[in-house]
Structures are given as C-alpha cells and as structure tokens.
Amino acid sequence: MSELKPHQPRRSAIRNWARVAAGMVFGLLVAMLVGSVSSALIGAVIGWDIMALCHLALIYWRLATVDEHTLAGRAAEIDQGRRVLTAVFVAAAIASLGAIAVMVRGGHDPAALALASVTILISWLLMHSVFAAHYAHRYFQTGQGLIFPGDTAPRFGEFVYFALTVGMTYQVSDVTTDSQAMRRLVLTHAVIAFGFNTVIIAITVGLVASLI
C-alpha cells in the first residue's frame, strides 16, 4: 500500500471542513427562508435540523461503508476533537430547548409536536454519532482503549453500537475499555448523555403528556 503524501491528509481535512461549512450555509439559508414566512424560532429550529442532518449524512457516508483501513484515516478527518464534541452538545441542547419552546407555543398543534419530536431525535442522534466518530479516531490513533469481542477488526457500526450503549444505559456492555484515557472519555459521554436525557427528554415527555 503506497504511503500518503504529506499534503494529502491536510487536503482531506480541508475538504471535510468544506462539506461541513456547506451544510451550515444550507441550514442558515433554510432558517432565513422559513423565518421570513413563519416565526424566527421555527426557522432557527428547522435550520438546525437541516445542519444536523447534513452532518449526520457526512458522518455515515464517509465512515459507515468502508473497511477498517480506510476508516482509520476518515475517522481522523471527521473527528475534530473535544472542542467540536462540546460545541455539538451545546448546539444540540439549545436546539432541543428551542424545539420545546415551539411545542409550548404550538399547544395542541400536531405540526409543532412533530417538529419538536423530530428535532430532539435528530439532536440526540447527532450527539452520539459524533461521539462514535471520536471513539473510532481515538481507537485507531492509539491502537488501544476499546476491546471488541471477536477476531475481526471493528467497523464504524461497532463504534456506533458502543456510543449508543453508553448514551442510553450510561455503561459499557460486551465492548470493554482498557485505558484510563478511554474510561475518562466514556465517563464524560455518559454524564453528558444522562444530563441530556434527564432534562430535555423528561421535559418533552411531560409536556406531550400534558397536551394530549
């Protein structure tokens, strides 16, 4: 297998950022368009949904269909570190709160309930998918941190499985951790997921129950 030239990883990272930026611009345009014919809040929420869906499409398009050798390089391109993880979590939380506000204002409007539910689901899935990409990057970067059952090298689906397990149960299952750094990362993920699930989803369920 031929080695990559030094400039190639940088070009790949630039292309990845260009794709992310294109999704953000598209989302902003949709937000402005919807906001001009509806409320600014609804426009902002729908704009976030478009941005998040574009980023989800990028993650799964680039990572979900490749073997472990290609996955190692692409995960490094997609993952932008803890700052991006933090930014995604904050944006997802704000968008979800905005969706809850839309639901409260809409009262019994089915469209408002549907928009709020879809937004929270998209935000939740994006948060854990970004963590899955980060887990994949850390795993292939260090060669340790996670131990997967079986003899085959993990694909991206295994990292999504691990991220969703942590995000829904706040613990690991048959995939185990074997480094202090990975345990700290898993703990951070579990705490963030617990906070999101407890505050955002609990409020949403309570409001939906009161409106039915």
Question: What is each PLM-predicted segment?
Answer:
Residues 55-68, 129-141:
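Membrane-water interface of transmembrane alpha-helices
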Residues 60-78, 100-104:
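Membrane-helix interface/capping segments
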Residues 13-36, 94, 197:
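The first (N-terminal) embedded transmembrane alpha-helix
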Residues 40-57:
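Loop-to-helix transition at the N-terminal end of transmembrane alpha-helices
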Residues 176-195:
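Interfacial loop-to-transmembrane junctions
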Residues 139, 144-179:
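Membrane-proximal soluble regions of multi-pass membrane proteins
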Residues 30-43, 101-115, 208-212:
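Helix-coil boundary and interhelical linker segments in multi-pass alpha-helical membrane proteins
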Residues 71-91:
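Juxtamembrane helix-capping/reentrant segments at transmembrane boundaries
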